[in-house]
Amino acid sequence: MIKQDQRAERHIPVLLQPVLAGLMPLVGAKVIDGTFGAGGYTCALLKAGAEVIALDRDPHAISAGQSLVEEFFPRLRLVQMEFSQLDRVVEEKVDAVILDIGVSSMQLDEAERGFSFQKDGPLDMRMAQTGFTAGDVVNHLKARDLARIFKILGEERYAGRIARMIEKRRVVQPFLRTGDLAYAIEALIGRKPGDRIHPATRVFQALRIYVNDEIGELARGLFAAERILKPGGRLGVVSFHSLEDRMVKRFFSFRSGECMRSRYLPEIKTAPATFFPLFKGGITASEEELQQNPRSRSARLRIGVRTEAEALAADMKLFGLAEIASFEGGKK
């Protein structure tokens, strides 16, 4: 297993400087890093003098982070837990929460975890290594259900064609490897020379989100952060695709009282604002960062500042994703 310090050398957390500037961690500030991963944000927060509770559902991340715990003892506590439960790890409210949504670099780098089509491995994709795998989904769900997953969670334009191909081919040979699935999708859809995005990208995204219930996890995590932040506390969320970013944008919009209005609909009465958003439109990577860290290309940071108002009820309808709310994802 790769040690934490070795990972830190190769791992560059995206939008690190905007995250630190936005969260403004003071010496002694209590911060929750809900997505520890390779420890990039946590390490930077600790160096700024903060006290950090870092969560990750991936046991590999927790194991690899023990050297960091020793280095920064007693200011770092690592907990194997989903970030949707972050309000259960402290009794007092905190100064900041940071969430880096999606798959981590170290998960993508390890072929045996089955997250990447660029490195052949078992069709797994489980962050916590419990529950059903991506292979289970691909080999057992009906084509209409696969198409729904690919279309909604991956925003894949060829969702139906890909789902029907999978249903037909798995009768002869089940999909067991990431390379098998990626090759089959590329053979079906085709790929023009110079195409930067592999045709299997959105399908792999959709499967990963479904297997790990990432949409439900994000929604519950936003509500949990609202409950646990002090007045003036800051919530930062880094997302990597439009579905996640729309959820975060909508959350801050509704919680700030600036919900999407329409001249065709009656005015919506809103509760007292629990957040006000910073940096309208969010923050994306600078040209300098893009050159140093290409992974930051699709990243967007949104930050909200907690008000003194009481936390509001957790209502999934807020996100306008009724068709997604029925997905149980990794809870099966």
Curated annotation (Swiss-Prot):
The lineage of its organism: Bacteria, Pseudomonadati, Pseudomonadota, Alphaproteobacteria, Hyphomicrobiales. The gene is rsmH. Specifically methylates the N4 position of cytidine in position 1402 (C1402) of 16S rRNA. The keyword Glycosyltransferase does not apply. It is found in: Cytoplasm. It comes from the Bacteria. This is Ribosomal RNA small subunit methyltransferase H. It is an enzyme of class 2 (transferase). S-adenosyl-L-methionine binds at G39, G40, Y41, D56, F83, D100, Q107. Gene3D superfamilies: Putative methyltransferase TM0872, insert domain, Vaccinia Virus protein VP39. It comes from Bartonella grahamii (strain as4aup). It catalyses: cytidine(1402) in 16S rRNA + S-adenosyl-L-methionine = N(4)-methylcytidine(1402) in 16S rRNA + S-adenosyl-L-homocysteine + H(+). Keywords: Cytoplasm, Methyltransferase, rRNA processing, S-adenosyl-L-methionine, Transferase. Disulfide bonds: none annotated. It holds the Pfam family Methyltransf_5.
